[in-house]
Design a protein with these regions (language model features):
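Short alpha-helical interdomain "coupling" segment at the junction between an upstream regulatory sensor module
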Residues: 150, 166-183
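Short beta-strand-to-loop transition segments that serve as allosteric relay/switch motifs
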Residues: 75, 136-145
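GAF sensory/regulatory domain recognition
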Residues: 43-47, 54-82, 207-210, 217-232
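Acidic/proline- and glycine-rich, intrinsically disordered low-complexity segments
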Residues: 77-101, 123
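Allosteric cytosolic regulatory segments
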Residues: 156-164
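A short, aliphatic-rich beta-strand micro-motif
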Residues: 120-129
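Glycine-rich acetyl-CoA-binding "A-motif" of GNAT/NAT acetyltransferases
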Residues: 133
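Short regulatory/linker helices and ligand/cofactor-binding micro-motifs at input modules
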Residues: 19-37, 41, 45, 183-200, ...
Length: 232
């Protein structure tokens, strides 16, 4: 959203930075190759705006309901296996309540769960779209009180914009997948109508089936009723 008073951004360097970060995130809706690429770029953009030593972008899994780290910077390589339930840890609390949280000193926070030694300060904000929490952006610092309330407010704005961008990219990817499936069905119907030779028809069926479900392999078996067995 454009600033009604552009001169105010010039007088306030922090406001100008805020607008630049929001614009960089918003532009990913049209420039990112896919949602996975956008996640990596979003985290890099956000981390560069704060004195953060590590950070992560975690998403709520529709299959397990858990909070799974999609991308991270500065954390141990095996942190991808580190999954939290909603309400568990600081990021889990943010995911469950859909509210940002700042912890100036993690040593005095009973909800804190360590993913990296040396972290002293942490803040997290929800990724959301259409009123639903999609995940959490989490930043860590090795200095006590490294993040302020103003930083948390900024992170909340960035995370909200990031959630909108990712939601749009996921919608586009679903539409593209549906379009590809429709194209495959049309091609399959055309093959049946043109009455291909049996060998060609079977080959078309397997190729179309593989493309339709984006599968690595598709096999078509012939059932022998007398022997009660399948033949490849």
């Amino acid at each position: 959203m454009a600033d009604p008073n552009p001169q105010s951004a010039i007088r306030d360097p922090q406001s100008a930075t805020d607008l630049a970060v929001l614009h960089a995130i918003a532009s990913l809706a049209s420039s990112a190759a896919d949602a996975a690429s956008a996640q990596r770029q979003i985290l890099s953009i956000i981390m560069a705006a704060f004195p953060a030593d590590s950070g992560s972008l975690a998403l709520l899994s529709p299959e397990t309901g858990g909070l799974e780290i999609g991308v991270q910077q500065g954390l141990p390589s095996d942190v991808g296996e580190f999954a939290l339930k909603p309400g568990q840890g600081i990021t889990g609390w943010v995911a469950l309540h859909g509210q940002p949280l700042l912890v100036p000193d993690v040593a005095h926070e009973p909800r804190y769960i360590s993913a990296r030694a040396g972290v002293r300060c942490e803040m997290a904000a929800p990724l959301s779209a259409d009123g639903h929490t999609l995940g959490v952006v989490n930043l860590d610092a090795d200095r006590l009180g490294a993040f302020t309330d103003a930083d948390l407010a900024r992170l909340t704005r960035y995370a909200a914009e990031a959630g909108t961008v990712l939601h749009r990219l996921w919608q586009y990817e679903r539409l593209r997948a549906h379009s590809q499936q429709l194209t495959t069905l049309v091609e399959l119907g055309h093959a049946l109508v043109t009455q291909l030779a049996p060998e060609e028809l079977l080959s078309t069926l397997t190729q179309s089936g593989r493309a339709l479900f984006n599968a690595r392999l598709c096999l078509l078996h012939d059932y022998d009723g007398e022997r009660r067995e399948l033949r490849l």
